[in-house]
């Protein structure tokens, strides 16, 4: 017997549906996969029998499972079930919308938000820094990037920004077009303040000694706005 990948998928779906049906008969609450498999397998079988139309099966698919037949939260996870079923006159897509009515219980992962605004970084002291893009390409800086180590074509007082990041919402960014100059608000990086990666100017605990080393590195590597003491002495192995 030679089967196409599509036929193998349908056999697997039928097997999963039968397993789900047996568990339902035993009173076992179905999970997401089992619920979808049971509905899909039933529709395939009824379509193959040829006694019901696609429209009738769409309605029937909403009566197969009740909220108490599935685990808490499963009903809200299944917004629709779509299955390509073989009818006597050809293959048709049967889509069952909201196959299981919600039972009013809490949905796993559901968020309840307050109506008022949320103040980000509340209580953290911010400093304002004027930044200019002296390069010929746009530069975009993410919310948690160590601002001291941003693109070397951004000109600003780098010493003032050591150990700081943008005071903006997580996941957002600030963009500087070529020649653009504007001020940004920065706050201290939280946590244990061990800064690694970025442009490898720090790669250690962010303290005063690290700042001296980082400023020297930045000046050597051509980062605009980096001013290092000409009498710099390597007191710590870099």
From Swiss-Prot:
Residues 1-102 are annotated as: Urease gamma. Its EC number is 3.5.1.5. GO terms for molecular function: nickel cation binding; urease activity. GO terms for biological process: urea catabolic process. One of its GO terms (cellular component) is urease complex. Pfam families: Urease_beta (PF00699), Urease_gamma (PF00547). Pathway: Nitrogen metabolism; urea degradation; CO(2) and NH(3) from urea (urease route): step 1/1. Residues 103-238 are annotated as: Urease beta. Keywords: Hydrolase. It catalyses: urea + 2 H2O + H(+) = hydrogencarbonate + 2 NH4(+). Heterohexamer of 3 UreA (alpha) and 3 UreB (beta) subunits. Four heterohexamers assemble to form a 16 nm dodecameric complex. HAMAP family: Urease_beta, Urease_beta_gamma. In the N-terminal section; belongs to the urease gamma subunit family. In the C-terminal section; belongs to the urease beta subunit family. This is Urease subunit alpha. It comes from Helicobacter pylori (strain J99 / ATCC 700824) (Campylobacter pylori J99).
């Amino acid at each position: 017997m030679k089967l196409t990948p599509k036929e193998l998928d349908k056999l697997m779906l039928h097997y999963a549906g039968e397993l789900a049906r047996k568990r339902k008969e035993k009173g076992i609450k179905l999970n997401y996969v089992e619920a979808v498999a049971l509905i899909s397998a039933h529709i395939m079988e009824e379509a193959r029998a040829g006694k019901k139309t696609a429209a009738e099966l769409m309605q029937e698919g909403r009566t197969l499972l009740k909220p108490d037949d599935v685990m808490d939260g499963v009903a809200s996870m299944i917004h629709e079930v779509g299955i390509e079923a073989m009818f006597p006159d050809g293959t048709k897509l049967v889509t069952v919308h909201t196959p299981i009515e919600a039972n009013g219980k809490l949905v796993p992962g559901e968020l309840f938000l307050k109506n008022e605004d949320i103040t980000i970084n509340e209580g953290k002291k911010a400093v304002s820094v004027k930044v200019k893009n002296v390069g010929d390409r746009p530069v975009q800086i993410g919310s948690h990037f160590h601002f001291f180590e941003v693109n070397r074509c951004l000109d600003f007082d780098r010493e003032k920004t050591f150990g700081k990041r943008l005071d903006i919402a997580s996941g957002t960014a600030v963009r500087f077009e070529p020649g653009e100059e504007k001020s940004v608000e920065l706050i201290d990086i939280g946590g244990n303040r061990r800064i690694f990666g970025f442009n490898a100017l720090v790669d250690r605990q962010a303290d005063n000694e690290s700042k001296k080393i980082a400023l020297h590195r930045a000046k050597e590597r051509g980062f605009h706005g980096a001013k290092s003491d000409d009498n710099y002495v390597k007191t710590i192995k870099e």
